[in-house]
Amino acid sequence: LAREMGGCPVAGISVVTETAHFGGTMDLLATVAAAVPLPVLHKDFIISERQIDESAAAGASAILLITAMLETDQLARLIDHGRERGLETLVEAHDRKEIEKIRHLPFDLMGINNRDITIYEIDDSDVGRTEDLARYCGGARLLISESSISSAKDVRRAGASGADAVLVGTAVLKSSSVQKFLYELTSAGWPP
């Protein structure tokens, strides 16, 4: 699957390593990172420097930090540790309060998750949260609309709201043809 995705016009590949709820592993991260020449994002509930060290050792290019799970000082410390290990940081928010909490931090990418991952929400959300919150993110960093992207229409909506990119997960795994699906998304027109 990673090689198939790597043959598409995508900016990178996201790998979930959380085991209990999502069935991922660090071995999967290492396998994907070794298999593709693209940047690989390590997605998990990262709360410690040890996890960041493991991300770097597995070949990740970037890590996800979830604002809802961390205090501001923890976020700052983990961002710094990631940079020391050569990793970019995608800091994720899902409401306006979280955006304000992280605005001053030196992360690389800002994500708006259209689902509330802290409660393992995996329902049929849409990009409405990105549409509601993108205007509060400023324009200094790349903004990524995460999750609930399942069509070219969703991509156009995210772009129209101010997102610079989208992170697609479940819809890729559910598609009958990964390459066809990804080409449909990447040819959606950005921004609309």
Question: Can you describe what each PLM-predicted range is?
Answer:
Residues 9-10, 35-38, 57-63, 83-87, ...:
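Glycine-enriched alpha-helix->loop->beta-strand junction motifs that scaffold or abut catalytic
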Residues 42, 90-92, 111, 144-145:
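Generic enzyme active-site microenvironment
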